[in-house]
């Protein structure tokens, strides 16, 4: 009996400890929108950590802050009406300095450092950031390639080599280079976030066992939800076992999603083309992408789906289904194996294989680039199956464009515009093997006089039940150094 009582006391002691609450105002935070509250917030986190864990509460109010340093076994709870505000750097005060990284040459500055953030954690476990409040990153810098000095923050949330992390129910606004940079994080759950920012939304880099669901991400100047596998950790690590489901990505003018205005007038993206906003695998791809499932997602006023490996990683076993897109500014589907090779010397070219894309509906897509599947000479993309695809393109392609030569550009940054206008109206495939396209219907808002499909160095292709809705349809196939495709009704 005494033994049972002892264990019950231990259990309730652990339960109370794990559910201890720490109000940031009790540690000196004012929440008045003027005072810098990060010292008080960090004191509350330290107290919770010393107690063995707990919940750090932000009541309603605005909390200007510099770097907030997470600890293990901590929940950050932003209550309704609370705003965690990224403060503007001053000569006297600012964010934590970017930590040294001897592998920084393999990726941009923004991917190489984690401490120069509004909220950051490293080598932690059991961390939750949640609540109905807002993270406002107004004071963060949005640059990525240029080195930023001490005191300048460029990410809202950065996590490195952590496990058992949950992000839920937050709203995030203007969050610098990344709303979230998670690198080397295992067992990561991201649910019901609303993000309206001026660069990347969710960057999931070298992570394993990730669940992204029910998120709304508006990123006109960069990618919305993006999986990466850089070399910033100093070793190769795949991003694997990831599901992305029930999400909405867009490229509306920044701040207009959370405000409900959904304004489409905005300057072009940093690369000189139309807004981003999409779901993408890549560009950083020293490691690989394996066992990825993307389903039930909507793209609006943004670029299309992109699957890219250009730094030596393997991209394989990818399943994508039930996708709808509207007002798409470049290729609805872009699959690229390239040779940029931002990896240690001697890293071989990567691979792409076993890709399945099913049940995709696209309306009002830019016709310049068509759907693109492009490997490299002697490095074929393999085993791609695209089925139940309906696309309505803008059209407008000319007969003269049908003779355009598509450059290889093996080392160039991967975007559809790297190839210029494509000589096919629906699909261009190059350096690929075992490609199957079935149950496809393609229409054009204005006539397009380019051939429908161009195959270049393609082996073992099958086209089944492909319908082209266009009067005076031009040639269906153009073949260059390719096997004759099997065409089935």
Predicted regions located by residue number:
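Bacterial Sec-dependent N-terminal signal peptides
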Residues: 1-21, 258
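Extracellular/periplasmic carbohydrate-active domains that bind, remodel
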Residues: 17-489
């Amino acid at each position: 009996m005494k033994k049972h009582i002892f264990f019950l006391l231990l259990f309730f002691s652990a339960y109370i400890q794990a559910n201890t609450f720490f109000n940031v105002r009790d540690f000196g935070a004012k929440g008045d929108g003027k005072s810098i509250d990060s010292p008080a917030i960090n004191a509350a986190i330290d107290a919770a950590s010393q107690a063995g864990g707990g919940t750090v509460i932000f009541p309603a109010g605005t909390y200007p802050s510099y770097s907030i340093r997470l600890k293990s076994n901590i929940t950050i709870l932003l209550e309704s009406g609370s705003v965690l505000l990224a403060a503007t750097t001053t000569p006297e005060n600012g964010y934590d300095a970017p930590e040294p990284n001897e592998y920084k040459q393999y990726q941009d500055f923004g991917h190489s450092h984690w401490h120069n953030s509004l909220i950051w954690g490293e080598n932690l476990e059991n961390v939750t950031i949640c609540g109905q409040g807002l993270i406002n990153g107004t004071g963060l810098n949005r640059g990525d390639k240029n080195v930023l000095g001490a005191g300048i923050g460029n990410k809202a949330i950065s996590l490195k080599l952590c496990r058992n992390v949950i992000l839920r129910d937050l709203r995030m606004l203007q969050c610098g280079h990344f709303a979230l940079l998670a690198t080397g994080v295992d067992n990561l759950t991201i649910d019901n976030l609303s993000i309206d920012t001026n660069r990347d939304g969710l960057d999931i880099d070298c992570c394993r066992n990730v669940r992204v669901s029910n998120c709304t991400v508006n990123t006109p100047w960069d990618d919305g939800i993006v999986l990466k596998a850089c070399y910033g950790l100093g070793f190769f690590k795949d991003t694997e076992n990831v599901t992305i489901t029930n999400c909405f990505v867009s490229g509306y003018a920044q701040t207009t999603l959370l405000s409900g205005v959904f304004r489409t007038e905005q300057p072009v993206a940093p690369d000189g083309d139309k807004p981003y906003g999409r779901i993408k695998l890549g560009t950083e791809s020293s490691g690989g992408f394996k066992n990825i499932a993307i389903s039930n997602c909507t793209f609006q006023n943004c670029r299309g789906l992109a699957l890219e490996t250009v730094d030596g990683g393997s991209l394989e076993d990818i399943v994508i289904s039930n996708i709808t897109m509207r007002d798409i500014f470049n290729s609805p589907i872009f699959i690229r194996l390239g040779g940029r090779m931002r990896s240690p010397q001697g890293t071989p070219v990567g691979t792409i294989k076993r890709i399945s894309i099913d049940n995709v509906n696209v309306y009002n897509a830019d016709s310049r680039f068509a759907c693109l599947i492009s490997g490299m000479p002697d490095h074929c993309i393999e085993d791609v199956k695209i089925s139940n695809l309906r696309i309505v393109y803008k059209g407008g392609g000319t007969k003269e464009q049908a003779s355009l030569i598509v450059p290889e550009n093996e080392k160039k940054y991967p975007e559809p515009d790297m190839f210029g206008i494509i000589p096919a109206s629906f699909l261009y495939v190059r350096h690929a093997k075992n490609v199957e396209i079935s149950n496809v219907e393609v229409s054009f808002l204005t006539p397009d006089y380019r051939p429908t499909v161009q195959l270049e160095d393609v082996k073992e292709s099958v086209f089944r039940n492909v319908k082209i809705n266009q009067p005076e349809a031009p040639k269906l196939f153009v073949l260059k150094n390719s096997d004759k495709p099997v065409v089935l009704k």
